Amino acid sequence: ILNNKQAITPETTELLGKTFSTSAEMWLNLDAKYQLRKIEKKLSEKKELTYVKAEFRKLMPVYEMNKKGWFVNDVSTVYGIKAERKRIFGDEEVVPENDSMNFCARQTKFDYDFTLRYCNVWYQFAKIFAEKESLPVFNKAGLETIAKNLCSYTLKKDGINKIISDLHSCGVGFFVLSHLQKTYLDGAAFTLGNNPFIVYTARYDRVDNFWFVLAHEISHILLHFDHLVKGCLDDMDSSAGSELEIQADAKASELLHTDEILALGTQYRHYFTLDRLRQISESLQIAAPVVLGILQHYKIIEWKKFSSLRESAKEKIDGEFIKG
């Protein structure tokens, strides 16, 4: 009975009553109270778990993140949820403010019930992954050289991994972290300690999109390093709404020779051929998929044309740089 391996029965209450000179009813009542407390405890624990789960789901898309493998604790338990909250926010009880951002965001698509919270969680995870990186001291001059030669990387056979390697060599972290639903993020730039980081979400998993996002985030680092302690999270579908974004767009366009591409492409607007596209690519020494992406972005070429030039960027990136 003491080890909870045998229940109290009417027969055992009679024996206990005789042994301790008490009534059998007293033992029956004690057992009834004990069983009731056990039920109440289970109900209380179930109620707590239901509440904790509900609050956790308000902050982030739990099912999606669990599927991605982002959690290290069992989020089906109260203990696991509290441990994850502490890992993400630094405090298991913290409730992030819904009306404030700990980062600069460029977005037009917006869901007031989810976007702020989910973007904040995504950013916290980006920093968690960044903390695991070991980088040399940031070399701004080295990054400026990379930026100056950005177009030449697009032409290299393994240009994507080459530029990632060169970024790391000059103290700039890079990794892929997929976006979360309702965040609409393409990329981000932020600093951790004295090192800048670039994160690519591969929301639009195309080679041209990779180079656009990379050029934009490199521009943020070169132009707005002091602002990146808060982080810049970018939805490239949206228009630049702040001075920082306008400046980063202008710098990225310069790095990718956007004006020159548009000048050459506009004259063929109504009769574009693959040969003409490649001529522009060769004359400006920038990969044809990037030229195509720029001309499609500015609606000079329809999206459905030259689909053979569209390739996955993520498939070209070494697995060590893909975090989740």
What are these regions (language model features)?
Residues 1-324:
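Active-site hotspot residues in diverse enzymes, especially metal/ion-binding acidic/histidine motifs
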